[in-house]
Amino acid sequence: MSFASDVKKELTGLEVHREHAKAELAALIRMNGSLSLVNQQFVLNVQTENAAIARRMYSLLKDHYHAQAELLVRKKMKLKKNNVYIVRLKQDTQKILADLDIMDGVVFNGNVSNEIMGNAQKMRSYLRGAFMASGSVNNPETSRYHLEIFSIYEEHNNDICKMLNYYDLNARTLGRRNGYICYLKGAEKIADFLTLIGATNSMLKFEDVRIVRDMRNSVNRLVNCETANLNKTIDAASKQIENIQFIESTVGLTSLPEKLQEIAELRLEYPEVSLKELGEMIPSGAISKSGINHRIRKINEFAEKLREKSA
C-alpha cells in the first residue's frame, strides 16, 4: 500500500463534528461526483477506487440526510485494475446538492461556498475531503517531497489553493492537460498539511522516515567529504614521496638544507602519517602543521628545479 493510501485510510476513520463533516462530504461529491438525468430525475454517482472512502460517503449521506443511497461495486476490466466503488443517490438529489451548495437549482456552483471559506474548521474538513477525493503525496523515502490535489475546474482549484494558503502552506497552482492541480513542496509544509486534515499518525510516520532519510544523507555526505579529504592527503603524500625519491636518486638528500633534509627523511620513513603527525616527530623539536607544509613546499620546489635542469 502506498503512503497516500495509508493517509486516506487513516482519514476515513476520523470522527468529525456533524457540521464539519458536511464540508468533507461536499468536497468528495464535488470532486468525484457526476450527474445524469434518468426518468426526469437527477441521479448522482460518486466514484472512488477506495472502499473505505466509499463507505464513509455512504455513511455521511445516511447520517446527514437519511438518504436512500446505494453502494455499488464494479470491476475494472482494463489492465486488471482495482474495483471501482460507486455511491449512487437517486432520491432528493437536487435537495442534497443544494444544501451542500454544489448546485443552485439546475446550475452547478464552481466555487466552494462562502460558508466554508469563512470557517477555519470547515475549511480543514473540506481539504480533508478534497485530499481523499483526488489527492496524492509522494512516499517520504523518495528524494522529492510533493503533495497535490487535482481539480477539473480552475475556480475550484483556486479556492483550494486559497484555503491551503490561509494556513500558510505556500500552495501553488498548475494547469494539467485535463484539469488543474494545487500542490505543496517541502517536507515541513506537507507535514503541516497532514496535521491540518487530521492525519496525525501519517504525519508522524512521514517525519520519522524523513528524519532517518535526512540523517542517512548527512552521514553519506560526511563520509564522502572525509573520503575526499583522505584521497587528497594520500595524493599529496604520494607527490611528496615521489619528489623526495627523485632528489635522492639524482643529487642525494644531503644536497638539501639541513631542515629540509630532516623532513624528507622522515617522510620517506613514515609515508602514511599526516603533516601534523610529521611535525610532532621532528627530533629537534615539534613543528606546527603550517611549518611542515612550508618545508614540504620548499622540497617540492627543489625537485621541480632539478627536473627542469635535467630536461
Curated annotation (Swiss-Prot):
Listed SUPFAM superfamilies:
Homing endonucleases
One GO term in the molecular function aspect is: DNA binding
Single biological process term from Gene Ontology: cell division
- Pfam families in the record, alphabetically? HTH_WhiA (PF02650), LAGLIDADG_WhiA (PF14527), WhiA_N (PF10298)
Q: Which InterPro entries match?
A: Homing_endonucl (IPR027434), Sporu_reg_WhiA_N_dom (IPR018478), Sporulation_regulator_WhiA (IPR003802), Sporulation_regulator_WhiA_C (IPR023054), WhiA_LAGLIDADG_dom (IPR039518)
Lineage, top-rank taxon, reads: Bacteria
The entry's keywords: Cell cycle, Cell division, DNA-binding
Q: Which residues form the signal peptide?
A: none
The DNA-binding region ranges are 274-308
Q: Entry's NCBIfam families?
A: DNA_bind_WhiA (TIGR00647)
What family is this protein classified in?
Belongs to the WhiA family.
Q: What does this protein do?
A: Involved in cell division and chromosome segregation.
Protein name, UniProt field = Probable cell division protein WhiA
Species of the source: Enterococcus faecalis (strain ATCC 700802 / V583)
